[in-house]
């Protein structure tokens, strides 16, 4: 019986140390070193109201905004995941055709604008995907296309640094910059 009680104490102490102690230390270090990312990379609008995270996509359908990649989980972070559909599945083609129709163009569309990412929550689109949307956004906002194009180019970055050729744009940050009139 003593061995059982001793073993139980060791298990409870180990769980407390690993679950509470380790987590507390890691959270404390993260808060001290990078508080913004430790809190979820939250993004605020001009009034200071938190409107989202730099790391999680949001759905935008208003023509005044740049639209993100489609999401297989309707931009629900709790349900993150892909559609698990085969590329040969007819539902993929049907979904892509509906998205293309929403853009209202016959021109070739960048692939990332009609295909969901693996988790369905990718907050970035390609520079080409953002630039493709310039005419619609500029018209809806009554802005000059060159102004919108310049803002997109300014916010585009190479995720792998100088070794990465393709540049991407964070959709939420771009839309907030558009709202701010940057």
Predicted regions and their residues:
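Flexible, solvent-exposed loop/hinge segments and secondary-structure transition points
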Residues: 2, 6, 18-19, 24-140, ...
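Extracytoplasmic/periplasmic C-terminal soluble domains
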Residues: 139-182
């Amino acid at each position: 019986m003593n061995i059982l009680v001793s073993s139980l104490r060791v298990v409870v102490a180990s769980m407390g140390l690993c679950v509470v102690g380790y987590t507390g230390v890691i959270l404390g270090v993260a808060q001290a070193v990078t508080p913004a990312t430790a809190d979820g990379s939250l993004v605020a609008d001009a009034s200071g109201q938190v409107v989202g995270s730099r790391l999680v996509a949001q759905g935008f359908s208003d023509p005044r905004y740049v639209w993100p990649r489609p999401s297989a989980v309707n931009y629900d972070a709790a349900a993150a995941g892909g559609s698990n559909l085969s590329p040969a599945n007819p539902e993929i083609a049907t979904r892509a055709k509906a998205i293309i129709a929403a853009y209202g163009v016959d021109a070739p569309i960048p692939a990332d604008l009609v295909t969901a990412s693996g988790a369905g929550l990718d907050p970035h689109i390609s520079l080409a995907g953002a630039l493709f949307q310039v005419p619609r956004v500029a018209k809806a906002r009554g802005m000059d296309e060159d102004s919108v194009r310049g803002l997109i180019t300014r916010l585009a970055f190479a995720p792998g640094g100088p070794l990465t050729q393709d540049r991407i744009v964070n959709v939420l940050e771009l839309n907030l910059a558009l709202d701010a009139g940057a």
